[in-house]
Amino acid sequence: MPARMSALPVDERGYPVPWFVHWSDGKPDFRIMDNVKRAVAVTQRKCWLCGGQLGRFQAFVIGPMCAINRVTQEPPSHKDCAIYAAMACPFLARPHAKRREAGLPENIAPDNGIALLHNPGVCLVWIARSFFCYSVPTPDNPRGWLIKVGDPVETLWYAEGRPANRLEVLEAISRGLPILTEAAKLQGREAELELAKAIDQVRRILPPPLDGVPDPDLVTVGEGGTNALKS
């Protein structure tokens, strides 16, 4: 555990409680982010996980679909805090783990944007120098907003608490890509072309190829035909 996270409170199981976690009746609910702290994190440049001051670089813990659209709900963290979360968080580290929805407070606002509720099986620590926030109002959450991450200076893929290999990442992308593809189709040809471009950019940050293991084809609509996410 990073030293800067050692001052965090722990729950009854002994797990450190990240700074962003919502507390109810004196107990942390790891499923819910504190929306006040979410705003403080971006306006005061606080680490999403430890609450300390961020420096020049920001590390986002995101899933493979967020790597494609470069959009996330969660503010950035220190690099070492983000890596610890990617390796130690039960939901992120265990591909078959599921979020518990039972008993969620009724006053919790729905997530902004298109939520991908499945566990992708891999996560990515996306390290950048910049990000910006933009408004995403919905009928249920008129003050909703999301974060667009800047170009990465470093990317680190993880699965099962260790560095992920290329095939694991590609398989995770294949599970979520149909959702983005259908959303792009509804928005029209320009959105489909933008998606193809975004997928091509993700290809450049995949883990290295595995000896003797070909990449699976991940095809989306592109200008003049189709584009496959392959090396």
State where each predicted segment sits.
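N-terminal alpha-helical interaction blocks
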Residues: 1-41, 110-231
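Short metal-coordination and nucleic-acid-contact micro-motifs, chiefly zinc-binding Cys/His arrays
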Residues: 40-44, 71-74
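Short cysteine-rich clusters marking metal-coordination/redox-active sites
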Residues: 47-51, 78
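Cys/His-rich metal-chelating microdomains
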Residues: 50-53, 84
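Short, non-ligating residues that shape and space the ligands of small metal-coordination modules
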Residues: 54-60, 87
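Short linker/helix segments within small regulatory modules
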Residues: 63-75
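Short metal-binding segments enriched for Cys and/or His
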Residues: 75-97
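Eukaryote-specific, cytoplasm-facing alpha-helical/coiled-coil scaffolding segments in long proteins
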Residues: 101-110
